[in-house]
């Protein structure tokens, strides 16, 4: 698992600017969605096109957050990347990666194939949301209908988990924030290839775009933000 602590001098600057470390000190759980980005075989399996070795370590935290989000009355959304052919994304697949890398990604992310499937240790449920995207961001309206679906369910807060921290998770989180969703990246619910890339993304995000919380902190927020009637019934 990546380290999740920020240097004290960085936290001091946050407090100087914001008056506190965390942007969102409370959430309304019924208006909250846990968004799980690209936890697919393509990014979790050994030798897959986008393998992130640490991604598999996220599974216990993601499953816990999914259970807690459902129990609190929120929405769980599973986002899967999909590609059909290189012509669907020419600037990236024809220019920014080698041809053999592009072919590997298209092969692994073809809907119906093994690479496109969710990692088998995850615990999705039938009533969860399942959406597909064809760009890095799940909150780019031309690439994914997730923003519209969440708005229709009166969601105003999103919790971002998945992989890669500094690519699809970050792109999704930034676009969510720019679309006026209160956005929290989960520090031990995202993974990438290096600690440096992971922490750099989280530092920028909490400083400018939204908030960063651990899974344990997020569980506490979800429980505290439950409707009183739901909490009393339990």
Where are these regions (language model features)?
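Glycine-rich, phosphate-binding/catalytic loops in enzymes
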Residues: 50-54, 94-95, 177-178
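Short acidic/His/Gly/Ser-rich catalytic and metal-binding motifs that mark active-site loops
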Residues: 42-45, 87-88
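Acidic-leg catalytic submotif of subtilisin-like serine proteases
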Residues: 33-43
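A short alpha/beta connector and helix-capping loop motif
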Residues: 30, 48-81
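Active-site-adjacent betaalpha module
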Residues: 1-33, 67-72, 83, 89, ...
